[in-house]
Amino acid sequence: MPDTLNLDQANLTRQEAADRSALISTHDYDVHVDVSGAQDLDRVDYPTVTTLSFSCAAPGSSTFLDYLHHSVETVELNGVMLDVHQVVGAARILLPDLQAENTVTVVGTSLYSSSGEGMHRFQDPADGQVYLYTQYEPADARRVFPNFEQPDLKARFTVHLTGPADWVLASNQPESGRRVVEQGEGPDGGSVTVDFSHTPALSTYITTLLAGPYHRVEDTWGGHPESGAPEVRLGLYCRQTMATALDSDTLFTVTKAGLDFFHELFGVPYLWGKYDQAFVPEYNLGAMENPGLVTFTEQYLFESQATQAQFEGRANTIMHEMAHMWFGDLVTMTWWDDLWLKESFADYMGTLAVAEATEHTGSWTTFASRRKAWAYVQDQYPTTHPIFADITDLEAARQNFDGITYAKGASVLKQLAAYVGRDAFISASREYFARHAWGNAELADFLAVLGEASGQDMQAWAEAWLQTSGVPELWLEAQGDTGDLVVRQEGFDPAAGRTVLRPHVLKVGRYEPDAQGVLARVSSAEVEVPGGSTGDRTVVENLPGGTNGGTRLLLVNDEDLTYAKIRLDEESLRAVLAHPVQDSLARATVWAALWSMTRDGLMPSRQFVDAVARLSAQIPDVGVYSQVIDQAVTAVEHFAPAAEREQVRAVLAKALTDALRRIGPGSDRQRSALRSLGRLARGAGEQTADRFVQVLEPLAHQDQTDLPDGLAVDAEARWIGLNALAALGRVDRPTLDAAREDEVTARTTAWHWTAVAALPEPRMRTRAWNAVMAGRLDGQQLSNDHLTALAQGFTASRPDLAAPFTDRFWPELEGIWSSRSNGLASRTIHGLFPATQDAVPGGPAAQESHPVVQSAQSWLDDHPAAPRALRRIIVEELDDLRRALRAQAS
């Protein structure tokens, strides 16, 4: 350990982690956290006592603990009290002169959080009750208790949690004992300490705590004798005021189906003692795979009408987190370079489980439409990176929970299963668990078992797919000399600056109109595209029908087996712009191709919106339908030229209002159309505003008489109307306040904040800007959700209203980053970036002279040493802006 260790440095590097891992081996943690005073909101901290035992390979050496504390009272190492003034910094605690076997005890206090990082505290606006939960990944366990915060230093944890006697107190493992604390601080004067059974070996980032007056429902999964899995107790938690939205029967059905599926698939028992799932407020993520106590955003509890796409999305997240019990929890990556070893696998396995074990059999269609869209966007940024990434420190790790690590990785694993065969892929997974259970692994470890299972050397495949960046592009063309149909491929790795042609196993489909004018598959052919120098041109064999004749669609990547942007030939493009597609996966693939063309400036936004207006009503899959109409809204707001925007908006508005009246009353697609209509309305100019007001005003006033049949005026629908009317200046603050008082919940509170911030009044605009920049409003610290709500309102209406604040944005960036947690700083900067702009005259190249483009680029040029994570946000936002302006100017 270097003599000049900076005890205030929170950004642990990969090299520091490797050095520490080589020096020490962790054994056991005993962690006691006391939240009995949490209901006193003036109290900012809580006490912790942590005892940790570990071995040292080089006695006499030094190491350090990670701890982002409020205070440290004592540090005792091997029976010796250390001078806290000498060994304690803001982020680390020095442990000098180690013995072969060591025990350290730290007594300190930690801070409650309002950012969703560490110990988050939330007060329910409906009943005043206080709720706590923890969120640690990648490195926020150190905000709660001192530890060695890196994934390869696994240990057994024994946890004790003190809190009010009438609260639920929970952790990863089942309760093993409970004792009364004589002088507690709970509302009834009593507190208890709950002891939990010790865990198997696990990493710090997947330990967890839950405390509060949570509503609980229980059930049991019967086990899986073939794999040796015992009966498992199941639990569901939510806030008391969310209990009516907790559809426990559905949630338990999905959970049991997942446990059955993964035990059959992996043959490895779940051995974490219980399987609780908690739905918590103000959550930064979709969910977190804490073994024994998985946490989810309570957005997955539906208080208003929910679509099947929402239920499918929730089921997918449940399965994703469950897959982590094996990929991530049982076997954990050594360092964050290999984050894909858990996230890519969980994304793939989660979608597979939903498709094969639940009623949502079309989950691969939704994956093709939604998840891959995220991947394609992320992979085209200047910040793109390989799936197996170069993560030098924790700050870089936080930024790589992105569409590449999740959705691109999952798509590549789907291609891998096609490449080596599903049986070989699953066999490799089983062997991977057998070899590395309760330990850590790296890319080479998985490639080794995959090579054995498939009988192939997988190194070249891994180099092409896992260790390069960028999106391959595939298209079909007729070979000039022979007339053969060939698959063409282009690929460029922007990170390495070189061409890369990847191997693909894919299908090419031929579609022709049926009697109803719907494009139906008439033939298909499997094609093996080689990687390397011969991968640019591959002949398609055995595709009946040829390349000439009447209307037809030739679709490369039929069945969506691989990861690539698809180019459509001119005849195929004409076909899909005139006819709907019958097959759900093909339909999703076609719409993804059209959206890529729009984003790339190859298809005018007007043409894309026209296609959506004409054809979207014939998309039966609500997940694809909602994605496509949302993309059309984005096309209007960001890609349509200013001179055409209101005309294009009117085309889409008519299509959506027609959908409200003609699509099945009360249907999922009707609700999706309403949501998109609300988004589209917020930026409307005077010439189109009245069209929206006619539909949205009755919603805002809960007047069912003038609404389309089946359109329920629930809380969500009402606030869709109110938020749009606020942005248009067609409702006032007292009306918004009164609506909020009608129904006080966490969600209506956030919607109210957004609506007030959206009011097109200079005073409200300034109030919202100042609050987000200060992180406080009316003397109250903003939580993560409230900060986002204000930022969304600030940017909701016409861009000219936010323009006066643009020049004030850039000087604040470094101060925001240094003074806030990573999560809150990211929300602030993403939320206030001036992303909605009109192109300047002069064509695509002239957009480099756009004032906001110049300001953003100047900031990057002037701040080369700014934190990489901060620079990445600006680089990506700037890339989005450049893309939009170029499309407008094309």
Task: Name the predicted role of every residue range.
Residues 1, 8, 196, 224-230, ...:
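Hydrophobic alpha-helical and helix-loop surface patches within well-folded domains
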Residues 2-4, 163, 168, 237, ...:
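Non-catalytic accessory/interaction domains
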Residues 1-273, 299, 376-377, 401-407, ...:
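Acidic/His-enriched low-complexity segments
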Residues 67, 318, 756:
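Small/polar loops that bind or transfer phosphate-bearing groups
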Residues 4, 114-117, 204-213, 270-273, ...:
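Short, mixed-charge, low-aromatic patches
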Residues 25-27, 46, 137, 153-155, ...:
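Alpha-helical structural motif
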Residues 19-33, 157, 248, 353, ...:
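Charged, low-complexity, helix-prone segments enriched in Lys/Glu/Asp/Gln
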Residues 30-39, 332, 734-739:
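General secondary-structure propensity
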